[in-house]
């Protein structure tokens, strides 16, 4: 099995001959790649205290660090770096998580109906005030009988969808190790809030929100998600917001 894998690897290098021309053999290429990658892998994502950090991807000091994890949607933190998130908290760093957009349009209408029915029934049980109960019934009726596909979402529906995602994100952050709710930040960047799949362009209003968070927290380390293959995607826009904020500070 090992011989077959080695032969297959050699065939790849033969077809992509430039690497062999540069390094002489497949073995040399493998060693070079291994040496480059090994120093980017660590069990101490915030840096290992009281250790030589000359060959580590993150410096040992200061310890503990103030860390911000930027999550484009309210789930990208745990999807893309859940283990790292947990390890940072486990190793006693001061971890903040910033959800850059509400992610509201990803929530299905049936979810909103279910939560509104729950809200309606709770209000009917515990309060005589009809305000919230009537609003829940209004949203349920709209989604079941009046909504037209392709139109921008109503603000009340967007609020409900955003709230559902917000509480899911809060639960995920707590599970990952966040102890205090004031370390969970919902930025609700304005470029996202169109109610449609198509979003607005990044603006100074978005950048200002990120700048304020950076100024308030003063992080020693940041983790930023970004899909560089899609220049108009939400992940790329969120990355650009952080980079622009850093440039302006």
What label would you give each PLM region?
Residues 1, 6-74, 78-248:
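Active-site beta-strand->loop->alpha-helix modules in alpha/beta enzyme cores, enriched
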């Amino acid at each position: 099995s090992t011989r077959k894998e080695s032969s297959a690897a050699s065939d790849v290098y033969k077809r992509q001959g430039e690497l062999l021309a540069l390094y002489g053999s497949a073995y040399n290429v493998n060693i070079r790649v291994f040496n480059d990658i090994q120093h980017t892998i660590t069990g101490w994502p915030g840096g290992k205290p009281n250790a030589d950090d000359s060959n580590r991807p993150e410096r040992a000091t200061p310890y503990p660090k103030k860390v911000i994890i930027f999550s484009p949607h309210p789930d990208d933190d745990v999807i893309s770096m859940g283990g790292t998130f947990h390890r940072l908290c486990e190793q006693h760093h001061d971890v903040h998580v910033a959800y850059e957009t509400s992610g509201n349009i990803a929530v299905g209408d049936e979810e909103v109906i279910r939560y509104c029915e729950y809200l309606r029934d709770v209000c009917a049980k515990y309060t005589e005030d009809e305000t919230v109960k009537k609003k829940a019934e209004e949203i349920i009726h709209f989604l079941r009988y009046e909504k037209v596909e392709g139109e921008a979402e109503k603000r009340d529906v967007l609020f409900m969808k955003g709230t559902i995602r917000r509480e899911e994100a809060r639960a995920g952050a707590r599970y990952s190790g966040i102890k205090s709710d004031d370390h969970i930040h919902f930025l609700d960047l304005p470029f996202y809030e169109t109610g449609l799949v198509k979003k607005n362009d990044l603006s100074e209003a978005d950048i200002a929100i990120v700048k304020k968070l950076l100024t308030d927290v003063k992080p020693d380390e940041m983790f930023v998600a970004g899909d560089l293959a899609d220049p108009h995607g939400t992940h790329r826009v969120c990355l650009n917001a952080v980079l622009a904020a850093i440039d302006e500070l």
